[in-house]
Curated annotation (Swiss-Prot):
Gene Ontology molecular functions: Atg8-family conjugating enzyme activity; Atg8-family ligase activity
Residues covered by region (Flexible region): 87-165
Pfam families reported in the protein's UniProt record: Autophagy_act_C
Name of this protein: Autophagy-related protein 3
Compositionally biased intervals (Acidic residues): 143-153
Primary gene name: ATG3
Main location: cytoplasm
PANTHER family named in the record: UBIQUITIN-LIKE-CONJUGATING ENZYME ATG3
């Protein structure tokens, strides 16, 4: 506890005395400038209206390097139905596994993968594409080939597609909690920083130790600490994800997304069917490229809109998968690994 207090004091001092850089190093370091933070925030608010800009409660709480009225981003009422206890993922809930992104040659690079909590035995290798079916008796089916995956539009009336509650089984659903998420800019680390404020089913604010129940075990009191939200006069206790590793992780994600994009473009040139992926880095590329398409095709119809697909499909070798204004979309997907019980996608379905 004393250590966390000292670290919070040091962090506050660093934020107040940090030299502000206006030189973009987004691609090289994973860091962003205040101007890029505002650009990414405007994109997030535009694409996902549940997010909005907020202002400091008083002029004395504002930071000079961000515009008035755009001091931080916030979204309210994000649901959290489950606690991160042993019931979160059954017996496998105690395991944490690094999930690779599916690229060849990435074995052993655990530090660069995604942290997955539960769902796999310790002896299993995590493969994002190894998806199998489970029947009502709990028996694991054989792995499906890609060409056997059914079209979701054909499953509307398929009773076999209905997920049924196991009879007599215990539910992992806990009393509903909701969270207000805040994204601020860290001047010292030059990255976004996430703050979470939780509320119980009756809208009573959660105590700090209760909010920690929704944080992945290894992050508690290490990467995630209880902090006062910096833009309010009154003390609002929040769980905050420390940004010391954000830039390096974001750099890895950006590089891997670029590699996934190059892989997809190579497949297109070779005439291969790439389909639509929902997981891994190629799935993330799909999501961000859909965002690009919706921007370019907005207000266009017919052949003109069709041309946008061709432009996206025939991008040059120097095309990047994720632009700087899409930074916060990727950042929130990264933050979801710290709080998997909080439904971040509730705020930003692509």
């Amino acid at each position: 506890m004393a250590y966390n207090f000292v670290r919070s004091y040091i962090d506050t001092f660093r934020e107040r005395t940090a030299a502000i850089s206006h030189t973009s190093t987004f691609r090289e370091t994973g860091q962003i400038t205040p101007e890029e933070f505002v650009l990414a925030g405007d994109f997030l608010v535009f694409k996902f209206p549940s997010w909005q800009w907020g202002d400091a409660s008083s002029a004395g709480k504002r930071v000079p390097y961000l515009p008035e009225g755009k001091q931080y981003l916030m979204t309210r009422g994000v649901p959290c139905h489950r606690r991160l206890d042993d019931n979160f993922a059954g017996e496998a809930g105690q395991d944490e596994t690094i999930v690779g992104d599916g690229f060849a040659g990435s074995e052993g690079a655990d530090d660069d993968g995604w942290l997955r909590t539960g769902g796999m035995a310790a002896s299993q290798e995590a493969k994002v594409r190894d998806v199998r079916t489970v029947d009502e008796s709990g028996n694991l089916g054989a792995a499906e080939e890609e060409d056997e995956i059914p079209d979701m539009e054909d499953m509307d009336d398929d009773e076999e597609a209905i997920i049924r509650d196991p009879q007599g089984g215990s539910s992992s659903t806990a009393p509903l909690r909701t969270y207000t998420l805040y994204i601020c800019y860290s001047a010292h680390y030059r990255t976004p920083r996430l703050y979470l404020s939780g509320y119980g089913a009756t809208s009573v604010p959660l105590k700090p130790q209760e909010m920690m129940e929704d944080i992945v075990g290894d992050y508690k009191d290490k990467t995630v600490t209880i902090e006062d939200f910096p833009f309010f006069e009154h003390a609002l206790k929040t769980a905050s994800v420390h940004p010391c590793k954000h830039a390096s992780v974001m750099k890895v994600l950006l590089d891997r997304a670029d590699a996934a994009l190059k892989l997809r473009l190579a497949k297109l040139k070779a005439g291969k069917d790439i389909g639509k992926l929902d997981t891994g880095m190629e799935g993330l590329v799909d999501d961000t490229r859909l965002l690009k398409l919706s921007e370019q095709a907005k207000g266009k119809e017919g052949d003109e809109a069709k041309d946008d697909w061709e432009v996206l499909s025939e991008g040059g070798d120097d095309e990047v998968a994720i632009r700087v204004d899409q930074y916060l979309v990727v950042f929130l997907k990264f933050m979801a690994s710290v709080t998997p019980g909080i439904e971040h996608d509730f705020t930003m379905g692509v």
